[in-house]
């Protein structure tokens, strides 16, 4: 008899785990998946082009219901199928509608939810997040009826939402508490390049903002008041200021949680029958909000569940890329540096190109690329592999090809 594997969550992490299991051990488990959205699995990364009208829901659907049926996976999808209770003693889960399913092994992939700024007016109609297909549908409906939008937060998600609403014909103001967008992903120079480009595309910015109150009229948001007394009109406000791991279900059954569900290097919780991965977890003090580490976690957990050895998850530097058509930027690692670092910088304002490499002890510590990002993967490899740059330092700014040619020359000389 097959073991019963239950996965709570059908988002990026849970679905990637399924894909990995279908490769490594397709016949080992009877698998049941619970997802609280009424679909199969869609690519959440593609919500921005969905909002902009460049893609349809069918375009971004990666695993429809037929896929689950074809692989013998039971899928319970929709709000009524959201799991509300884990009984660790009986090894079973209970959904909102009363569906009860037993497990031998359980995976929690409950993801995260948007952080909503707790200020007066945050519950007004027209205040929403940008997280799933339902959010996109609500944003499109609002764009069809209203003209002015504000996006609070100039991180990756906020800028993608802002450009999507701009493409829908809205006048969009981006509100941010720093002087540059993507201040956690870019240095000052690259941030200024990006801001200038977005201004040229029609976005407005209110930077270093102290957001105080969302002002409403007849229960509908009409604008934002700031600490300096200024006011921005907006009848649609998008909150894009971060996420909070969904840990309540794990907490309610007694699993150890801090900011996220605590897991080991094999993604195991303190209950040996229960695993967790994705945006709901905390691993060695880190929580996660980008796709790349989620996919790495899925590979490690699939290895463990399929009993092909004991792979261990390690948090690696994650590269940043902006998904706005025509804007190319990349950053990875420590791109700010300190007094012990060397800085290699190339800047061409007329071409809109900026490159900065941060070196420490003859190794790459971080990189920022704006306008020309072709070598991003190369710099990511140098960082991950902790490559000694002593032989290629004069060439590293110019990318992989010159560096490989240099190493080939040295190899020939040494033969």
Protein language model regions, located:
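Mid-to-C-terminal Rossmann-like scaffold of FAD/NAD(P)H-dependent oxidoreductases
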Residues: 1-4, 10, 23, 280-377, ...
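Beta1-alpha1 glycine-rich phosphate/pyrophosphate-binding loop at the start
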Residues: 1-77, 164-185
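Rossmann-like NAD(P)H-binding beta-loop-alpha module
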Residues: 138-186, 221
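Cysteine/selenocysteine-centered motifs that mediate thiol-based redox chemistry or coordinate metal-sulfur cofactors
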Residues: 139, 389-415
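FAD-binding core/adjacent interface of flavoenzyme oxidoreductases
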Residues: 1-6, 62-150, 225-229, 238-240, ...
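FAD-site-proximal beta/loop scaffold in flavoenzymes
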Residues: 123-145, 216-225, 230-303
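Residue-level detector of alpha-helix initiation sites
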Residues: 12-15, 38, 112-114, 134, ...
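A Rossmann-like FAD-binding core segment of flavoenzymes
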Residues: 30, 75-95, 101, 168-262
């Amino acid at each position: 008899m097959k073991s019963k594997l239950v996965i709570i969550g059908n988002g990026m992490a849970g679905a990637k785990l399924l894909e990995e299991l279908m490769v490594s051990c397709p016949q080992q488990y009877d698998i049941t998946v619970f997802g609280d959205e009424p679909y199969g699995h869609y690519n959440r990364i593609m919500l921005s082009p969905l909002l902009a009208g460049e893609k349809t829901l069918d375009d971004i659907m990666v695993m429809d219901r037929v896929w689950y049926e074809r692989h013998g996976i039971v899928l319970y999808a929709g709000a009524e199928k959201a799991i509300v209770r884990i009984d660790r003693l009986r090894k079973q889960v209970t959904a909102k509608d009363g569906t009860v399913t037993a497990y031998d092994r359980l995976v929690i992939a409950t993801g995260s939810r948007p952080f909503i700024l707790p200020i007066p007016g945050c519950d007004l109609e027209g205040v929403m997040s940008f997280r799933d297909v339902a959010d996109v549908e609500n944003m499109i409906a609002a764009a069809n009826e209203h003209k002015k939008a504000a996006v609070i937060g100039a991180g990756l998600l906020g800028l993608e939402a802002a450009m999507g609403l701009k493409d829908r014909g809205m006048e969009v103001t981006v509100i941010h508490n720093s002087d540059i967008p993507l201040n956690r992903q870019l240095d000052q120079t690259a941030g200024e390049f990006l801001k200038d480009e977005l201004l040229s595309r029609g976005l407005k910015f209110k930077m270093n903002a102290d957001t105080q109150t969302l002002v409403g009229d007849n229960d509908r948001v009409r604008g934002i008041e700031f600490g300096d007394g200024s006011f921005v009109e907006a009848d649609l406000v998008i909150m894009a200021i971060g996420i909070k791991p969904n840990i309540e279900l794990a907490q309610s059954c007694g699993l150890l949680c801090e900011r996220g569900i605590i897991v080991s290097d094999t993604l195991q919780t303190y209950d040996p029958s229960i695993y967790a991965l994705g945006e709901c977890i905390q691993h060695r003090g880190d929580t996660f909000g980008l796709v790349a580490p989620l996919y790495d976690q899925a590979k490690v957990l699939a290895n463990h569940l399929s009993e092909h050895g004991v792979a261990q998850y390690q948090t690696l530097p994650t590269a940043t890329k902006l998904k706005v058509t025509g804007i190319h930027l990349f950053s990875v690692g420590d791109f700010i540096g300190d007094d012990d670092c060397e800085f290699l910088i190339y800047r061409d304002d007329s071409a809109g190109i900026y490159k900065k490499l941060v070196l420490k002890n003859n190794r790459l510590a971080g990189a920022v690329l704006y306008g020309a990002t072709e070598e991003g993967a190369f710099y990511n490899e140098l960082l991950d592999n902790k490559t000694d740059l002593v032989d290629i330092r004069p060439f590293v700014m110019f990318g992989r090809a010159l560096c490989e040619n240099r190493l080939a020359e040295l190899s020939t000389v040494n033969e």
